[in-house]
Amino acid sequence: MKKIILFIIVFSSTLSFAQITLYHNVYVNSEDQSKFEMVERDYMSKLAQKAVNDGKFIYWALEKVLQPSNAMGGEVNHQLVGNWYQFVIVYSDMKAYLNAGPWWSDTDNLLGVPQELLSYKVKQGGMYLWHIKDSAMVTGAKFSAYNFGFSEEPSKFIESQKEYKVFFENMNKTNQNGRAGWVSGVRVSPKNFGEHNVMTWDGFLTLEDAMNHWTNWVESKKEYKKIHLPNGFDLKMIAAKIAETSAPSN
């Protein structure tokens, strides 16, 4: 396990189709999770909020992956052992992503806390850059259900999602089945043939709502073929929001 000084990079209530979302994954052992979450929630979220207020990006969050509770990325994702977390940052466009700079670094002046006191133990995972293509958003989601797959025709996959968008928009209006948002996107980086290159995100109000979504989901080859995803969504995750920013205060 590698000890690092806080380095944060890595979703949202108002989306435009130029938006870029960065996910930065880290693995935290069970015994280190309390400090890790405290540092991010009580300290680093303040730096993220300042960056939002300054227009560097639109949204920042830390999510804890709850499901699946098995081996992922070479580590066991289970509360008794450790969990994957992901930092989530939403930028207005690619230019904003490229120009954001090291917004997390000025802890001494902005927080009054030396950066070395905010260090913790994590194992670095990957960083994944996604382009948001469509959305049906409302506020209030506290749990995220992610679906990842590979399509040889990602543009056709995105086009196929339009009918689902209308369906989810209607559900979001009354939070039917606990729904609180939906997004579709394509991966920008890393960009390797055969790896996950399309995704959808479903927001939910409670963990029970998110788990019921899985329970009631009937998958079929026919439906996957219809959306140009022959092997289906072969990775699904449910994550809880640990900390997040709010709308700009200025």
Label each region the model flagged.
Residues 3-16:
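Sec-dependent N-terminal signal peptides
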